[in-house]
């Protein structure tokens, strides 16, 4: 039973339809926070999206830094419930290698729990 639950949770984060690949994640602490997700590796993407799980979260700003030093600002300003995803974010210039993704966010509601912010990419 525990193995089935663990496999189900693992699959919900690692397997996505239509070619989406898990890039990385961060856990948002209670209150306002700024986090950096270092990407690295040889993968390149045309699109990314953000998925929030385990608690509600307000994402105010998202900065995407590319391997060549360019920066893309995405002003999301969205409140996400657990399980919600952002819109698909098209990266300029076709397939791009990511260096890092920076988030400015805060947990919302009265719960003092943490929300998980996962970044997914599509080639």
State each model region's role.
Residues 58-59, 81-84:
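A short local loop/turn or secondary-structure capping micro-motif enriched for an aromatic residue
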Residues 35-40, 85-93:
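Exposed aromatic-hydrophobic patches
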Residues 24-28, 73-81:
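Solvent-exposed serine/threonine-rich low-complexity stretches and specific carbohydrate-binding patches
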Residues 15-38:
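Transition segment at domain starts
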Residues 43-50, 93-109:
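Noncatalytic modules at the cell exterior or secretory-pathway interfaces
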Residues 2-9:
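Bacterial N-terminal signal peptides
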Residues 54-76, 112-122:
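Short, surface-exposed beta-strand/strand-loop-strand elements in extracellular ectodomains
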Residues 30-32, 41-45, 55-57:
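Short, surface-exposed loop/turn motifs at beta-strand boundaries within globular domains
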């Amino acid at each position: 039973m525990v193995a089935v639950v663990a496999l189900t949770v693992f699959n919900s984060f690692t397997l996505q339809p239509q070619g989406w690949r898990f890039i990385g994640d961060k856990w948002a602490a209670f209150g306002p926070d700024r986090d950096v997700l270092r990407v690295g590796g040889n993968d390149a993407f045309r699109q990314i999206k953000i998925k929030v799980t385990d608690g509600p979260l307000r994402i105010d700003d998202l900065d995407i830094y590319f391997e060549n030093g360019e920066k893309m600002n995405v002003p999301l300003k969205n409140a996400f419930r657990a399980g919600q995803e952002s819109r698909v974010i098209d990266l300029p210039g076709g397939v791009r290698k990511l260096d890092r993704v920076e988030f400015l966010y805060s947990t919302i509601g009265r719960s003092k729990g943490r929300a998980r912010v996962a970044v997914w990419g599509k080639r």
